A protein has these predicted regions:
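Conserved non-catalytic scaffold segment of RNase H-like nuclease domains
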Residues: 1-51, 102, 114
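Alpha-helix N-cap/helix-start motif at coil-to-helix transitions, marked by capping-box chemistry
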Residues: 16, 71, 91-95
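Acidic, Mg2+-coordinating catalytic module of metal-dependent nucleases/exonucleases
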Residues: 40-47, 52-53, 57, 89-138
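Substrate-recognition/cap helix-loop segment adjacent to the acidic, metal-dependent catalytic center
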Residues: 49-73
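Short alpha-helix plus adjacent loop in nuclease-associated cores
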Residues: 74-91
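Short, polar/flexible loop-turn hinges at active-site or ligand-entry regions and domain interfaces
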Residues: 5-12, 61-68, 107-111
C-alpha cells in the first residue's frame, strides 16, 4: 500500500514504542491536564480516516485520554475545500489529494505522492489557497 513493502512494515518499531514517542512529543507542546491547552488534528480526509486510527492507537496502548491531547473537532481540508470546488466538482475525476491540489492550481510532483511530508505540504498548500479565498477576520 502506498509503495510500502511487507518487509518495510515488518521492520517498523513496535506500536507501543511509537505511541510513547508520540506522547513524548505531544507533552512538549500540550499540558494534558489543562482542558484549554490542546492541539487540532489537521489533515486531508482525516476526520473520516486518520483520526480513527490515531484514536485506536491510544486505546490499544491503554490510554483512555486521547481527548486530553486533542480538541474533539478537527480541521479536515478535504471537507473545507468542498464549497470552493462545487462549480467544478462534477468535472473532477475524483476528490483525492492530488486531484484537488491540481484543481486548485498547485503544481504536483507525482513521484512524491504518498510521501508523508509531501502530502502534508500539499494539504497545507490547499489550506492556504482556501484561506486566501475567505474574508475572515478574527
Amino acid at each position: 500500500m502506498a509503495g510500502v513493502t511487507l518487509e518495510q512494515v515488518q521492520s517498523y518499531q513496535p506500536m507501543e514504542e511509537g505511541y510513547r514517542q508520540l506522547v513524548g512529543i505531544l507533552s512538549k507542546y500540550v499540558n494534558k491536564f489543562d482542558k484549554r491547552d490542546k492541539m487540532y488534528l489537521v489533515g486531508y480526509n482525516n476526520a473520516g480516516f486518520d483520526n480513527n486510527f490515531l484514536r485506536a492507537l491510544f486505546t490499544q496502548c491503554g490510554d483512555k485520554y486521547f481527548g486530553s491531547w486533542f480538541y474533539p473537532n478537527c480541521m479536515d481540508v478535504y471537507v473545507m475545500v468542498t464549497p470552493f470546488l462545487m462549480g467544478v466538482r462534477n468535472d473532477m475525476e475524483n476528490f483525492k489529494l492530488m486531484t484537488v491540489a491540481r484543481t486548485m492550481g498547485i503544481e504536483i510532483d507525482e513521484n512524491k505522492l504518498h510521501d508523508a511530508t509531501y502530502d502534508i505540504e500539499l494539504t497545507r498548500d490547499i489550506f492556504y489557497r482556501i484561506i486566501g479565498k475567505m474574508d475572515v477576520k478574527l
